[in-house]
């Protein structure tokens, strides 16, 4: 090679260049990112991979790629957006999961704009760990950001349920979907009994 660097080995017939978690090829001085490296073939995915490589080369940080929280959006009308596991994937990996939903037709901003098609759907474990989220509707790609952040940082569903969201915005849909996780507890027979018991002291 002209650069005096040993080339990376790519098996014949392989559709992409094989890399490790740090995006290094079989020659550890050569990195591969973007479509040639396989994985999610999105512009934002290539940008994420570039950041991993820069941290490894320039700052000598052992940065590793993790595509578990890589968002994807289909720019149709309405938009389709997803991050993390689907319901089917989650049920295969976990014994029990909860499905949280909230429709845009319950959102005041969507009503005001007369664009109420769509909903937010989230998949969580019984203890509130977020596994994935899907959104269909106007600006679905933009609304996916908090779910992507939660998955990336390992935040539980309570983090999204407790965040203060400006009114009226479509962002409230995600907050309400997250809050749906607590509905069985808030409206359970036990909770009603506690409320009745406490109200007795106010008489």
Write out the residue ranges for each language-model feature.
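FAD-site-proximal beta/loop scaffold in flavoenzymes
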Residues: 1-59, 161
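A short alpha-helix-loop-beta-strand transition element characteristic
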Residues: 6-11, 60-71, 95-100
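Small-molecule pocket liners
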Residues: 15, 71-72, 120
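Short secondary-structure boundary/capping segments
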Residues: 21-23, 65, 112
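Short, flexible turn/loop "capping" segments at secondary-structure junctions
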Residues: 25, 29, 66-68, 126-127
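Short, flexible active-site loops
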Residues: 33-39, 67-76
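Internal hydrophobic alpha-helix adjacent to the cofactor/substrate pocket in enzyme cavities
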Residues: 44-67, 96, 151-157
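Flexible, glycine-rich terminal cap/loop adjacent to redox cofactors
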Residues: 75-86, 91-203
